[in-house]
Amino acid sequence: VNHPQITPISQKFIPLIGVICVICGLGWIGVGIQAQGSQPKLKFDFGPGKVAPGYTQVVKDTIYDKNSGFGFEPGGEISCVARGGRDALRSDLCTSDKPFYFSVALPEGNYSVTVTLGDSDSGTVTTIKSELRRLMLERVETAKGKFANRTFTVNIRTPAIKGDGEVRLKDREKTTEWWAWDEKLTLEFNNSHPAVCAIEIKPVEVPTIYLLGDSTVCDQPLEPYNSWGQMLTRFFQPGIAIANHAESGESLRSSLAAHRLDKVLSVMKPGDYLIIQYGHNDEKEKGEGIGAFTSYKSDLKKFVTGARRRGGNPILVTPVQRRSFDAASKITNSHGDYPEAVRQLAKEESVPPIDLNAMSKLLYEAWGPDLSKQAFAPNDNTHHNNYGSYELAKCIVDGIRSAKIGLASYLLSDVAAFDPGRPDPIESFAMPPSPKANSVKPLGN
C-alpha cells in the first residue's frame, strides 16, 4: 500500500466546504468540511449493498481525492462485498488480506471514531492504527455472523500556530511523516481478516494528552521502528485524545527553536496534560553553559512553566535507557546527569515524575543482553520495534498510576498492573506490521 502523493504544505491545505453529490440516483449527501464547532457527524457505510439512511456509501473504487474529501488511499487491494440481509449497515463490508487505509479530510482537532466490524459469512480479526501508526485497537475478533462496535478518540493537527507562524518542519516531516500534519484523518486497517462495515466520525471537545520529546517518543512512520508514544493510545479509553508532537532528533533547545512547544501551547486547554521526555540529544550538545543542571534543566522548566500558564498539567519523564550492557549484564548509565536533572526539577517544581530511566533499566536487565535485542530495531541500541515500544508504553502507564496522576482514570479497564522486572514474553505479542518499511535509522541515534 502506497502512501498518498506528498505535496508542499502550501498546496496541501484543502478548504472543503459542503460538497454535495448525487450518484447513481441514490441521492446521498457528500462530506462537508466546516469549522469544527459546526461540523456534523460523518457516517460511512462500506460495501456495495443497501445504504443505511443518513450514511454515505463507500465501495472499492471510492479513492480519496481532494474534491470528495474521503476515500481509500491509493494502492490498496480491497474487496467490498454484499452479503444480503435486512440490516443495511451490517449486510455489506470492505475487507482485504493486506493492510489498507481510509482517509477523511478534516480540520485540526479531536475526533470520536466509531467503527462497526464483522462479517456475516466468516470470522474477522482487525487491528486499527491512526495517522502515523498510532495503535488505536490492538485486536478485535468477531465470530461468523457477529459484529463489534468500537470507539476511540483521534487527534489530528496542522503546522499552523494559532495567532502567528507555524512549526518549522524537518524534511522528513514533509515526506514520510506528512500524514502527521495534513488536514486528514487516516485510519489503517490491518491483521489477518479486517472487515469494516461502517465508520462514524464526530468532532469532540475532550481532554488532550500532548507529548513532546525525541525519536523514542515520536510517531515513527516506518517499520521496524516504533515508540512508546504511538503505542500509548491503545491503553486509554475514548474520551481523551493523545497528540504526539515529539520528533526524531529533537532536544529541548531544538524543539523550542522549531516552535513545537509554541504549537502545543497554542492549542492546549485548561486541564490538558503535557508529557515531556528529552535527553538523548540534549546530552550531545556542547558549548559554554551547556549541561544537565544548567541549560537542560533551565529549558525543561520553560516547558513546565508554559504548560502551567495555559492551565495544563506537566508530567516529566526521565530519558529511556539505551541498550548498553556491561560485563555483568547490567545496563550502564549512558545519559550522565540528565535523568537526575529531570528528577530534581520534578521535585523542585512539584511536577509528577515518571522515572522511565529506572524502569527501562529493570526491563532491559530482565531480558538480558540477548533477549533484549528482540525489543529493538535491527542493529540499533536506541530505537525500539513494536514489541519494545509496547512494553515501554506499559511502563509509562505504570508510572502514571504510581504517581497518582489524574489521567489514570482514563485508562482502559483491561490494562493490568505491569512489572518492568517481569516483561511480557515476546511469544505473547502479536502486532501486524504496517506496510511501509525502511532500514534508515531515525534521527538522533
Describe the residue ranges of each PLM region.
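Compositionally biased, intrinsically disordered or flexible polar/acidic segments
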Residues: 36-222
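Short, flexible loop segments at the rims of nucleotide/cofactor-binding pockets, characterized by
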Residues: 91-93, 250-255, 330-332
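Short, structured coil segments at secondary-structure junctions
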Residues: 130-131, 236-238, 310, 349
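Residue-level detector of flexible, active-site-proximal loop/helix-junction positions
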Residues: 142, 216, 249, 321, ...
